[in-house]
Amino acid sequence: MRASQSPMLDPRARQLLRTLIARYIRDGEPVGSKTLAQHAGLDVSPATIRNILADLEDVGLLSSPHTSAGRVPTAHGYRVFVDSLVQMQPPGEEEVRRLRAELASGNGTQSLLGSASQMLSAMSHFVGVVSAPRREQFAFRHIDFVALDARRVLAILVFADNEVQNRVIEPRRAYEPAELERVANYLNAQFAGRALADIRACLLRELRMAKSEMEQLLAHSVELASEALVPADADDMVMAGQTRLMGVQDLSDLDRLRELFEAFASKREILQLLERTIQAPGVRIFIGEETGMVSLEDVSLVTAPYAANGQVLGVLGVIGPKRMAYDRLIPLVQTAADVLGAAMQSPGAR
């Protein structure tokens, strides 16, 4: 539920809801009217506070556990809190310094993604997750072809971020080593520094306009490049800190925890969720059932896209219990996205 769908609350109700949720996030215990009377900073009687809490419960922002006289926020209550009540606590200078040091430019892309997920986990005490950029967004630096036998060719592809991929391709006909060398030299001379997604289309355009003496080389280049430069299936997401959730009180239901870890293992559902946020600017938050996935109904995700050279590359974030310190984690995730994007923008990463 977004802020526009939230019930209208008067200033006293907003202050009580803010105080109650902040106390519950901090202590993990239902919050009663006596505690609120002491900490909400309102000059009202306990009876008035109880009436306001009852109203907040009636509109679905709070619930009352059977074993306690206090109240706890619902997913709807958390949504109102993060949309309009939370008071952000940006990361301190030391945290920002740690992020920049760990995500220093010059590291390869996979190393940066791993470091980012580990730092998010360490700084949030929950799960850090980073979706990987698609390889077709990256420029290639160099390509070589090696004949393995009469029908198979090894393509050795070096990307601008220093990642190397070896791909075995099976052209329609056998190629002599000299032919493979000519094609590699042509591709390196004409297309080094170009994104994979652009190269095949350029080759096809050039083939249509080519003079007869170039047609054979271009035709060979199109055939080999069509297979060698197709983005390979990759590890599309890097996660760290999954086991941290095993000690979280709010996630103590073993059956639900098993479903959550199955989602971590398959990655598909979490990747789908991250894909929904990749074109949305700034931080997006999914709370419980807002994820649309049963396995994630007990957790929240705080996500933000990261970009380099004006292009969104992927999404990073934190997965944790709904009772998380949103005031700290929302700005932390945004800062991590900014730092990772800056590192990816450096020549060593892209």
Curated annotation (Swiss-Prot):
One GO-annotated biological process of the protein: negative regulation of DNA-templated transcription
- InterPro entries reported for this sequence: GAF-like_dom_sf (IPR029016), HrcA (IPR002571), HrcA_C (IPR021153), WH-like_DNA-bd_sf (IPR036388), WH_DNA-bd_sf (IPR036390), WHTH_HrcA_DNA-bd (IPR005104), WHTH_transcript_rep_HrcA_IDD (IPR023120)
Q: Name one GO molecular function term.
A: DNA binding
Superkingdom to which the source organism belongs: Bacteria
Q: Which UniProt keywords apply?
A: Repressor, Stress response, Transcription, Transcription regulation
NCBIfam families attached here?
Answer: hrcA (TIGR00331)
Q: Which family does it belong to?
A: Belongs to the HrcA family.
- What is the stated purpose of this protein? Negative regulator of class I heat shock genes (grpE-dnaK-dnaJ and groELS operons). Prevents heat-shock induction of these operons.
* Protein name, entry field: Heat-inducible transcription repressor HrcA
Record organism:
Xanthomonas axonopodis pv. citri (strain 306)
